[in-house]
Amino acid sequence: MPKLKTRKAALKRYKKTGAGNFLRRHAYKGHLLMKKSNAQKRKLSQRVCVSSGDSKPIKLMLPY
């Protein structure tokens, strides 16, 4: 049986934790940052866990 391929786009966007959850970055942090406050930019810099409903397709894209 051939090996399962990893979706490289998902590999760049998500990081797997030890508990099996996935971490993702916030949106709205790429450009147009002058109008955002420092507190908002600092909050957007943190990583957040992917919701349980969205994690099932990510598990299929990242088999290893």
Curated annotation (Swiss-Prot):
SUPFAM superfamilies, alphabetized: L35p-like (SSF143034)
Chief location of this protein within or outside the cell: plastid
UniProtKB keywords: Chloroplast, Plastid, Ribonucleoprotein, Ribosomal protein
InterPro entries (UniProt xref): Ribosomal_bL35, Ribosomal_bL35-like, Ribosomal_bL35_CS, Ribosomal_bL35_sf
Compartment(s) of residence: Plastid, Chloroplast
Gene3D superfamilies: 4.10.410.60
rRNA-binding recorded as keyword: no
Molecular functions (GO terms): structural constituent of ribosome
Cross-referenced Pfam families: Ribosomal_L35p
Annotated GO biological process: translation
GO CC terms of this entry: chloroplast; large ribosomal subunit
HAMAP family the record matches: Ribosomal_bL35 (MF_00514)
NCBIfam families hit by this protein: rpmI_bact
Family statement drawn from the similarity comment of this UniProt entry: Belongs to the bacterial ribosomal protein bL35 family.
Designated name of the protein: Large ribosomal subunit protein bL35c
Organism: Thalassiosira pseudonana (Marine diatom)
